[in-house]
């Protein structure tokens, strides 16, 4: 057995509490231990408490992890990312700065389809190398788990290739990856005007191959009238359910109450985006127990002012989740701290609510609430030591990489260079 102890934490932000996702006022309860400490055994948390209590229980040969009187939080859980792709869309970023809209660029063959073309051309090594670079970006912000979508292949072979890259990255044990199949991200060039044929490909070939090799836990669909309308989206998601995959849905990014109602109907784990969802859609999601995953960085990067109604969701008792939506087009950021800042300034979530949304609530949205998301005995020792004096500074000092060191299952996977 390997034993270690984390000591000298100015604030140990544990988020300890009752099982289940947090809602309402409970989202502000972080269970902070000043001068806290933690004992770790074989990659799991063995004990948490005041430093004096933990020190008394240590054996003489216990390895000490010195937090240096910094703030320690659970590793952030980013519940919506697209981390495997080739190239960038910096040219499109410039086009948007000159006045072009996201929809106009997509209609001209850019957007998701441009990344699909570049990704199909890339070799396996190129894809894995790029994704490892992004792994470093996630770690620098204190993230230890990401939900990782495919969606830039849009052919049987290329979707499987992306999911196998995600499996490879997960096996490297620097970051935890939760794989999601997103073959219904866009209609590829060769199927333009033939959506029924492409949906058949997704249902008849892609999904069975994904399920046979256990390459994904979830299936997602970008459900919008001009991408995958309700009937094709429903058919894909029901086929995924029949194969044992759980559901996540890109919902109501542009069209109100379009996909939120579908997410509620099918009992999806999450409905993501929700920028255009009205009270009708929110009521349906709440009643069905679907967790909202809000992506303020994509709203910011697209130059929109339509942020999701986070305060309304919290008032309704919904277990809100925040995520980066890391992707090469609408949200090229892997920074959860930046998302925390946007959540406070643009959606008026408190720093405590935002922390809950990227830890405990995010863990439950991925079916991992009993294993990660808080610093409690029995859970994985996934945590980050941050360069700050108070957890609120993670959102307050925006645009920085706060993590001094990041640990996954008790092992250091990132340390800031001196």
Curated annotation (Swiss-Prot):
What cofactor does its activity depend on? Zn(2+); Fe(3+)
What disulfide bonds does the UniProt entry report for this chain? none
What reaction is this protein's catalytic activity? 4-imidazolone-5-propanoate + H2O = N-formimidoyl-L-glutamate
Give the E.C. number(s): 3.5.2.7
Q: Which GO terms describe its biological process?
A: L-histidine catabolic process to glutamate and formamide; L-histidine catabolic process to glutamate and formate
Binding sites annotated in the UniProt record for Fe(3+): 80, 82, 250, 325
Q: What cellular component GO annotations does this protein have?
A: cytoplasm
Detail which positions bind Zn(2+).
Answer: 80, 82, 250, 325
Give the pathway listed in the UniProt entry for this protein.
Amino-acid degradation; L-histidine degradation into L-glutamate; N-formimidoyl-L-glutamate from L-histidine: step 3/3
Residues binding 4-imidazolone-5-propanoate are 89, 152, 185, 253, 330
* Role: Catalyzes the hydrolytic cleavage of the carbon-nitrogen bond in imidazolone-5-propanoate to yield N-formimidoyl-L-glutamate. It is the third step in the universal histidine degradation pathway.
PANTHER family hit by this protein: IMIDAZOLONEPROPIONASE (PTHR42752), IMIDAZOLONEPROPIONASE-RELATED (PTHR42752:SF1)
Which named protein is this? Imidazolonepropionase
Which species is listed as the source? Solibacter usitatus (strain Ellin6076)
